Regions:
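Carboxylate-rich, polar loop motifs that coordinate divalent cations or form catalytic acidic clusters
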Residues: 1-222
Length: 222
């Protein structure tokens, strides 16, 4: 089926009508079950997140904001990053968006932009953040050559012992049993973080995991 979008979809979100929205190289794609619609804001959209109401939050290069419908249902883009001070404008791509405690978090490489009641707070990181995850209302980030951190307030709290695998590119952080974390690396297998220790998870597929690039992962109940 021709959908009229670009060649790559980065993330997918769904609204209360079960309509699908895809962050696409050509803009925001909407599928209502019958047909595709493209809403373009002239940017490659890297990530999209539906807030459970009427907004589809999106992130792009040096820009983030939201699409919302007009009285006829047509989606229009509203930039939030346009209100930033000039010194914060060059933040590169926004790759992840989360809702935590009624605030929206936009995560780029060196900045987290927290939207609360239409006000934006800027949280800066010296190291590049290459991966992030919202786990049980906690925002975790992997910082290049530094390890995994819990972000809270304006602070990044290091998870002890994760620095020993900080030169491995962690591509995914997942919840695991008994409040542990699974740290998925691109070429060095899977690690378990348990309070203060980080150890390899030995599996029958270790050779495959270490010879393949692990770009994303998900926990399944079965």
């Amino acid at each position: 089926m021709e959908y009229g979008g670009g060649t790559q979809n980065w993330t997918i979100t769904r609204d209360n009508n079960s309509w699908i929205y895809a962050a696409n190289n050509s803009g925001l794609l909407q599928f209502d079950g019958y047909s595709w619609h493209l809403f373009s804001n002239g940017m490659i959209i890297r990530t999209a997140y539906h807030d459970g109401k009427e907004r589809i939050y999106v992130g792009a290069f040096n820009n983030f904001g939201y699409f919302s419908p007009d009285e006829k249902g047509a989606m229009h883009y509203h930039s939030l990053s346009d209100s930033l001070e000039d010194k914060y404008r060059n933040f590169s791509d926004v790759w992840d968006i989360y809702c935590i405690d009624h605030s929206i978090y936009f995560v780029s490489y060196n900045h987290i932009f927290k939207l609360t009641n239409d006000e934006i707070t800027v949280i800066q990181s010296k190291e590049r953040m290459l991966c992030s995850a919202n786990i049980n209302g906690n925002l975790y980030v992997f910082k290049e050559n530094a390890g995994v951190f819990l972000q809270t307030g304006q602070l990044f709290i290091p998870l002890a012992s994760t620095e020993k695998i900080s030169n491995y590119h962690i591509s995914e952080i997942l919840p695991y049993q008994d409040q542990k974390l699974l740290l998925i690396t691109e070429y060095h297998g899977i690690y378990i973080y348990d309070n203060s220790t980080t150890v390899p998870l030995i599996t029958q597929n270790d050779s495959l995991l270490k010879s393949s690039q692990l770009y994303c992962a998900e926990i399944k109940d079965d």
